[in-house]
Amino acid sequence: MKKKIGLLVMAYGTPYKEEDIERYYTHIRRGRKPSPEMLEDLTGRYRAIGGISPLATITLEQAKKLETRLNEMQDEVEYHMYLGLKHIEPFIEDAVQAMHKDGIEDAIALVLAPHYSTFSVKSYVGRAQEEAGKLGNLTIHGIDSWYKEPKFIQYWVDAVKGIYNGMSEAEREKAVLIVSAHSLPEKIIALGDPYPDQLNETADYIARGAEVANYAVGWQSAGNTPDPWIGPDVQDLTRELNEKYGYNSFVYAPVGFVAEHLEVLYDNDFECKVVTDEIGAKYYRPEMPNASDAFIDCLADVVLKKKESVM
């Protein structure tokens, strides 16, 4: 009988319906309810992208397809997928409890975020390992980052190339690629967090692979807190690149995310497009990885490499 390995797929989570927004936001705010104005602002953003984010559906599809792919690629062990979310059910702890109940003794934990940071990956894996420690007889093997995975870089190289190939030579000369990820509080830099460096590396790999000479790194979706967040913000960067260098075609690659969701559909497709419209420039944004076969193959490689290194 094949050994069963847990596949713990972790992600941020998103409201399933409009009624979930308040409790979801309250969880993000560590139990503090948002003000009516804050709640109205967030609800308005969801309504602007069609009422609710497609993220919940995409995340589940990614996780299910990954489980299937891993069991197709090898016959040595049987992977059982468990989905654990940071801010809405099924919570990370729920997933770990389900694994324990099913008699899983070893699990590979994959966060659907390519870059490592203490705020994201470390906190997800930490929560999973803490719960496993309480239950006993369950070891969680966490994957720190996978932004260097060849198939991940290749996905974005192909996506960016696809857009540039549709441009005339004259347009290409005045086009710029903005590679971005979710901003985090600036204090992580002083603590030696590798997150900003990893995004810079990712941008270099993609620009080189796609043969794009003009590119810049930006940050997006910063939180509304008194602390400073990492910049430049993608909207400010867009204006600056237009004013300084006269770029009038902007290609946004939000590589810190793996699916179409609020931060991409609103912060990029709405807010950044408002800026490009304002300055009379063209807006482009490649399709996100979502549950594409190429991306699922990338994640499967990541999991199999981790399994080889720890078991």
Curated annotation (Swiss-Prot):
Transmembrane segments: none annotated. Signal peptide: none annotated. Fe-coproporphyrin III binds at Y12, R29, R45, Y46, S53, Y124. One of its GO terms (biological process) is heme biosynthetic process. The keyword Lyase applies. It catalyses: Fe-coproporphyrin III + 2 H(+) = coproporphyrin III + Fe(2+). It is found in: Cytoplasm. PROSITE patterns: FERROCHELATASE (PS00534). It is an enzyme of class 4 (lyase). Pathway: Porphyrin-containing compound metabolism; protoheme biosynthesis. GO terms for cellular component: cytoplasm. Keywords: Cytoplasm, Heme biosynthesis, Iron, Lyase, Metal-binding, Porphyrin biosynthesis. Fe(2+) binds at H182, E263. One of its GO terms (molecular function) is ferrochelatase activity. Its EC number is 4.99.1.9. It holds the Pfam family Ferrochelatase. InterPro entries: Ferrochelatase, Ferrochelatase_AS, Ferrochelatase_C, Ferrochelatase_N. Belongs to the ferrochelatase family. Involved in coproporphyrin-dependent heme b biosynthesis. Catalyzes the insertion of ferrous iron into coproporphyrin III to form Fe-coproporphyrin III. This is Coproporphyrin III ferrochelatase. It comes from Bacillus mycoides (strain KBAB4).
